Amino acid sequence: MAGNTIGQLFRVTTFGESHGIALGCIVDGVPPNLELSEQDIQPDLDRRKPGTSRYTTPRREDDEVQILSGVFEGKTTGTSIGMIIKNADQRSQDYGEIKDRFRPGHADFTYQQKYGIRDYRGGGRSSARETAMRVAAGAIAKKYLREHFGIEVRGFLSQIGHVKISPQIIGEIDWEKVNSNPFFCPDESAVEKFDELIRELKKEGDSIGAKLTVIAENVPVGLGEPVFDRLDADLAHALMGINAVKGVEIGDGFAVVEQRGSEHRDEMTPNGFESNHAGGILGGISSGQPIIATIALKPTSSITISGRSINLNGEPVEVVTKGRHDPCVGIRAVPIAEAMMAIVLLDHLLRFKAQCK
């Protein structure tokens, strides 16, 4: 399994499984003399961690991060930063029945076919629990971007199932509202509808998909390395690598199919751009406008409704997932998406400074 690292100058490698002893990551490329402690990282982990509201999995993990290396007397040294989070609330017995069965819609089948072995407890390496370390690494990236470049990376939930936030709100996000509710949603009326929908799904034992948007503001012009390391290509790669993500849009995304060139092009004046249909990226290079990315997440297949599948011998079986799971994985994905965008932006900023200025 070689796909555990992302980035070139700012590099993040994660390790660990859902029901293992701990999760961990190594972060290379953090410039020296950045003031850093666990307290700078923990707030983002607390936004992602399970068991914090009735809308997410009841699994309870403190997700307390510990910095092992790369920080001395409260500042980064320029060497590798190692971090771990110990797992505490595993209930591996919940997964005994699927040891020899493949959960439909999960990575069980493909991991078994590829490697000939799999950790069936909570999905092992394929579990979204792994993303805790991405959030930890992303918190470092967000801090550096904010303090050294004035770049803010923030996200919000825009849709769960058929319930969408008001289009008018998207143009002027109230970030205080986003942080004031467990859905990370800027639309108070949508929050009430989200609540009703999730309650209904939990009663039925089912799940639902979601859509969320991440915005990076104050990004300078020039980030991105055409042609294969375009900024939008690397963002799509990073965001698509989040568990359950099935679609990524930059700017207007798939809506461009119905637009005409006269509408979609972002006209320019001496005062700047007149619109931002491109999502802040032109020709794979940041334009100086806000970078906007939207991701779609599938409904989790971990539900209590029986589903057809096969076992290791290829025989038909019925599968019911008994573990603790999110009725909508999109809710806790907001800080994960923020982290992945921040990791990509810092990597490209360091590459830009090394080559251009």
Swiss-Prot record:
Cellular component GO terms held in the UniProt record: cytosol
Gene Ontology MF terms: chorismate synthase activity; FMN binding
Annotated segments matching region Disordered: 36-60
InterPro entries in the record: Chorismate_synth, Chorismate_synth_AroC_sf, Chorismate_synthase_CS
Cofactor requirements of the protein: FMNH2
Keywords, comma-separated and alphabetical: Amino-acid biosynthesis, Aromatic amino acid biosynthesis, FAD, Flavoprotein, FMN, Lyase, NADP
Sequence positions that bind NADP(+): 48, 54
PROSITE patterns xrefs: CHORISMATE_SYNTHASE_1 (PS00787), CHORISMATE_SYNTHASE_2 (PS00788), CHORISMATE_SYNTHASE_3 (PS00789)
Annotated GO biological process: amino acid biosynthetic process; aromatic amino acid family biosynthetic process; chorismate biosynthetic process
Pathway: Metabolic intermediate biosynthesis; chorismate biosynthesis; chorismate from D-erythrose 4-phosphate and phosphoenolpyruvate: step 7/7
Residues the entry annotates as binding FMN: 125-127, 243-244, 283, 298-302, 324
Cofactor note: Reduced FMN (FMNH(2)).
Catalytic activity: 5-O-(1-carboxyvinyl)-3-phosphoshikimate = chorismate + phosphate
Documented EC number(s): 4.2.3.5
Function of the protein: This reaction introduces a second double bond into the aromatic ring system.
Quaternary structure, from the entry: Homotetramer.
Entry-linked HAMAP family: Chorismate_synth (MF_00300)
Family label: Belongs to the chorismate synthase family.
Name of the protein described by the UniProt record: Chorismate synthase
Organism: Haemophilus influenzae (strain 86-028NP)
